[in-house]
Amino acid sequence: MSRVGKLPVAIPNGVTVTVTPDNVVTVKGPKGELVKAMSNKINIAVEDNSVVVTRDNDHKDVRALHGLTRALINNMVTGVNEGYVKTLELVGVGYRAQLQGKKLVLSLGFSHPVEMEAVSGVEFEVEGGTKVKVKGIDKELVGAVAADIRKWRKPEPYKGKGIKYENEVIRRKEGKTGKK
């Protein structure tokens, strides 16, 4: 039995979970609604304030899907109830972020500003010009948008300049030593 998959997903107050016969899970909550199609190899049932995920057989691929399905449903329930936030920090001289409507404009040392449109389901928040918060109810989408922002200037190991996640530790390197 999957250690993750055998745990039921608790449904908090204000959140409703519905499962169609073809395993399409719909989760509605105070922050919005998420719909996701799950594998038909897994059984999903809503039983008194919890979602129970079970499997029919012990094939390797079904065992893998068991824990995955439970984790995805848990992420959906948490997302519509609390939401997800990824915080990025811009480290470097002249590296700035600002909002223009729903568009995020980054100055990252290029000859042009980098503009990113907010994807539906994700919103940006800028604090002090050097911190960008990516907020949304879909964990996968929030992480993907944050990774797209970080991709423009990954932190470099010598001075630590670039865009990094808030709690990310940059492994630093020693520079070259001069000739004597």
UniProtKB/Swiss-Prot annotation:
Q: Which PROSITE patterns match?
A: RIBOSOMAL_L6_1 (PS00525)
Superkingdom of the source species:
Bacteria
Query: What residues form the membrane-spanning segments?
Result: none
- Please list the GO terms describing molecular function: rRNA binding; structural constituent of ribosome
Keyword match RNA-binding: yes
Any Pfam family matching the protein: Ribosomal_L6
Q: Which GO terms describe its biological process?
A: cytoplasmic translation
Keywords tagged on the record: Ribonucleoprotein, Ribosomal protein, RNA-binding, rRNA-binding
- GO CC terms, sorted: cytosolic large ribosomal subunit
Q: Which Gene3D superfamilies match?
A: Ribosomal protein L6, alpha-beta domain
Q: Ribonucleoprotein: present as a keyword of the record?
A: yes
**Entry similarity comment:** Belongs to the universal ribosomal protein uL6 family.
Quaternary state and interactors: Part of the 50S ribosomal subunit.
**Annotated function:** This protein binds to the 23S rRNA, and is important in its secondary structure. It is located near the subunit interface in the base of the L7/L12 stalk, and near the tRNA binding site of the peptidyltransferase center.
Tell me the protein's name. Large ribosomal subunit protein uL6
Give the originating organism: Clostridium botulinum (strain Okra / Type B1)
